[in-house]
Amino acid sequence: MARGALDWIGAELVALDAKGLRRSLEPIGPAQGPVVRVGGRALVNLCSNDYLGLAADPRVRAAAADAAARFGAGSGAARLVAGDLPPHGALEARLAAWKGREAALLFGSGYHANAGVPGALVGRDDAVFSDVLNHASIVDGCLLSRAELVRYRHCDVEELAGLLARTRARRKLVVTDAIFSMDGDAAPLRELADLCDRHGAMLYVDEAHAAGVLGPGGAGLAEALGVQDRVDVHMGTLGKALGAFGAYVAGERRLVELLLSRARPFVFSTALPPPACAAALAALEVVATEPSRRTRLFALCARMQAGLARLGFDVARVASPIFPVVLGTEARALAAAAALRERGWFVRAIRPPTVPRGTSRLRVALSAAHDEAQVDGFLAALAEVLPGLPPEPRPPA
């Protein structure tokens, strides 16, 4: 029975519909992969973060099933109470070694980590400097910290240098995505590390879309650029390239010791399920022993990048499996997604507030499980769809 106190929601939903901003769930099946069933149809999946094709890998699935049999489906409690099981410590040790750091700490999700870690490091008398295109979870974590939030232009090292020089904050924290999730480009980590060294600031890097994908050992952008030792807080996720679930922070042991007491999402959340930890451990073994997956992935990326450039899209800065096909209005992005679906391609329209107004897009994401024919087929379908999209609105005279 509907309650009158919620009657206002109907008008909100109508307003979202009118703006093309209402969201909905889209069940897929039977499992994550390069081809999925959506609404009873087989579609090529170009909107997943399963960059290495590990979410349905038999070894990863078997590890999860074995852990469920040995340790149970869930942890039953927070780590600090009665939920600290063997798979947690084993995974943290492996993650710390992978990232070349002293210690690591698991979180329930990337959002949990980003929402909780900044507040453990900075507060009211401090300042946090955040790239304007950082993930929403970073923005929320910065706001929750109660430190002054200073947002600098995207990858603009010069502007950040001026902001750091002028601040009177007690402690300074610079936070950036390694790979920006809606644009696919990379942060200038070397230059950011130089600035942090010069101004005594902490450097926090979210490697959610880089870990497993970049670097000689797949450990991320910091590894690829040789700056792992200059990043104070390495955050990453287990549910993208590693195909599992959860997140982690790696760094000095004293950092992890502080987070054990101060990171509220860690303290007040039930621990990750043991099967998720075991799946991530198995995925890390694949990352270590099968670098050919990354080689294959980036060969496909080069093919996609060249094809999108030929179609007129600005993808020159892309340094990852994420390709922004920016179409402008919400209507154009929605129409493109619908037309591509009719042709057998599953790619979602990304709209505000996820991206700035006027930059609605298709976020095309590749996996090592795709093949060249699928890349070429998508490019051909996109070329066919573009002329039939609604026209861009004319700028005011």
From Swiss-Prot:
Protein name per its UniProtKB record: 8-amino-7-oxononanoate synthase
Gene that specifies this protein: bioF
A UniProt-annotated Pfam family: Aminotran_1_2
EC assignment: 2.3.1.47
CDD domains: KBL_like
Known catalytic reactions: 6-carboxyhexanoyl-[ACP] + L-alanine + H(+) = (8S)-8-amino-7-oxononanoate + holo-[ACP] + CO2
Binding residues for pyridoxal 5'-phosphate: G110, Y111, S181, H209, T237
HAMAP family: BioF_aminotrans_2
Residue numbers binding substrate: R23, H135, T354
Domain of life: Bacteria
Cofactor: pyridoxal 5'-phosphate
Family the UniProt entry places it in: Belongs to the class-II pyridoxal-phosphate-dependent aminotransferase family. BioF subfamily.
A single BP term in Gene Ontology: biotin biosynthetic process
PROSITE patterns, sorted: AA_TRANSFER_CLASS_2
Involved pathway(s): Cofactor biosynthesis; biotin biosynthesis
Entry keyword Secreted: no
Function: Catalyzes the decarboxylative condensation of pimeloyl-[acyl-carrier protein] and L-alanine to produce 8-amino-7-oxononanoate (AON), [acyl-carrier protein], and carbon dioxide.
Keywords, sorted A to Z: Biotin biosynthesis, Pyridoxal phosphate, Transferase
